[in-house]
Curated annotation (Swiss-Prot):
Highest rank taxon of the organism: Eukaryota
Name of this chain's protein: Oxidized purine nucleoside triphosphate hydrolase
Gene: Nudt1
Species of the source: Mus musculus
Pfam family of the protein (one): NUDIX
CDD domains in alphabetical order: NUDIX_MTH1_Nudt1
Binding site for Mg(2+) 2: E52, E55
Major place of residence: cytoplasm
Catalytic activity: 2-oxo-dATP + H2O = 2-oxo-dAMP + diphosphate + H(+); 2-oxo-ATP + H2O = 2-oxo-AMP + diphosphate + H(+); 8-oxo-dGTP + H2O = 8-oxo-dGMP + diphosphate + H(+); 8-oxo-dATP + H2O = 8-oxo-dAMP + diphosphate + H(+)
Keyword match Hydrolase: yes
Keywords: Cytoplasm, Cytoplasmic vesicle, Hydrolase, Magnesium, Membrane, Metal-binding, Nucleus, RNA-binding
Length: 156
């Protein structure tokens, strides 16, 4: 890996449900995911997460809770994706479809894991248990995990 790029991912969690967005275009199109993207130059990771949540879902948030940090490697790509994962429980506004994402609430026992990124089934249970985690996933392509490591951490 020659370079890495900072990304954010925000999961809006409320009692018994989570807000996911159907990615409509670009990388990961056709999958449900949290809200996030690239951190822009001059922006903190948390500010980038808040901006992406607002742009993609129409929701604003006062407080984010950092819950995870995962690096993603894709065979053939020189760039490592350095993803900082946050949860938000109190948001302002109503989820609104954007050019990039179509938000939808899911009951926690009905999360569509078959239509999420394959790695989500490994770390999402930790998120729902309010545990913090770090990891690395190596993908052959967007559907195939070659190897991974994942561990709980006490704090960031």
């Amino acid at each position: 890996m020659s370079t890495s790029r900072l990304y954010t991912l925000v999961l809006v969690l409320q009692p018994q449900r989570v807000l996911l967005g159907m990615k409509k275009r670009g990388f990961g199109a056709g999958r449900w995911n949290g809200f996030g993207g690239k951190v822009q130059e001059g922006e903190t990771i948390e500010d980038g997460a808040k901006r992406e949540l607002l742009e993609e879902s129409g929701l604003s948030v006062d407080t984010l809770h950092k819950v995870g940090h995962i690096s993603f490697e894709f065979v053939g790509s020189p760039e490592l994706m350095d993803v900082h994962i946050f949860s938000a429980d109190h948001v302002h506004g109503t989820p609104t479809e954007s050019e990039e994402m179509r938000p939808q609430w899911f009951q926690l026992d009905q999360i569509p894991f078959a239509d999420l990124w394959p790695d989500d089934s490994y770390w999402f249970p930790l998120l729902l248990q309010k545990k913090k985690f770090c990891g690395h996933f190596k993908f052959q392509d967007q559907d195939t995990i070659l190897s991974y490591s994942l561990r709980e951490v006490d704090s960031f």
